[in-house]
């Protein structure tokens, strides 16, 4: 990824794995999305009406995360996933996020949009792992699936199919 984004995403991932708020893990004055030079947090947006370009590490990581999450939703909605299974899935998702953070190279603008998505994804993963007191793990899985789908709406990824989230 772009160097400044890599630092922020690394801090975001470390905070999520440690169970702290990403905003608390960032350097002072730099929340989880703070490398925007105009002071506003990055927002989800297209690249002049087009999806953002991706690279192989990002596409591969998101494909693997989709494959991990999609088959679990029906069982989660039915209450058939236990705490350990959620924690195991969260650990696998955290590995994928770490791989993306370490290996993908995006433009600074695309990187900023990806930060928003990965922040939502890692917040859901943290809750699934039990690192967010009182969180509903099934709802957290839906949050992760929604973040994966958001990626598909904002990033070019030939063949990407959104996850059916229905209840």
Regions from the language model: what does each represent?
Residues 1-10:
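Bacterial N-terminal signal peptides that target proteins for export
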Residues 9-19:
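Bacterial N-terminal signal peptides
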Residues 20-25:
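Sec/Tat signal peptide C-region and signal peptidase I cleavage site
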Residues 26-81, 163:
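Immediate post-signal-peptide N-terminus of mature secreted/exported proteins
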Residues 54-61, 82-89, 113-117, 140, ...:
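Amphipathic alpha-helix face/heptad-repeat signature
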Residues 96-115:
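Short, solvent-exposed, charged loop/turn and helix-capping segments
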Residues 103, 114-167:
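Helix-rich interaction surfaces within compact, conserved domain-sized segments
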């Amino acid at each position: 990824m772009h160097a400044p984004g890599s630092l922020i995403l690394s801090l975001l991932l470390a905070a999520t794995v440690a169970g702290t708020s990403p905003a608390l893990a960032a350097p002072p004055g730099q929340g989880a999305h703070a490398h925007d030079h105009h002071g506003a947090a990055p927002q989800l947006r297209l690249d002049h009406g087009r999806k953002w370009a991706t690279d192989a590490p990002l596409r591969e990581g998101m494909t693997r995360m989709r494959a991990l999450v999609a088959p679990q939703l029906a069982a989660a909605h039915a209450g058939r996933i236990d705490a350990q299974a959620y924690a195991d899935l969260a650990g696998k998702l955290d590995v994928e996020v770490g791989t993306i953070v370490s290996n993908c190279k995006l433009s600074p603008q695309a990187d900023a949009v990806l930060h928003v998505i990965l922040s939502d994804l890692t917040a859901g993963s943290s809750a699934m792992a039990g690192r967010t007191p009182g969180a509903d793990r099934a709802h957290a899985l839906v949050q992760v699936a929604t973040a994966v789908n958001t990626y598909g709406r904002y990033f070019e990824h030939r063949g990407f199919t959104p996850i059916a989230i229905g209840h």
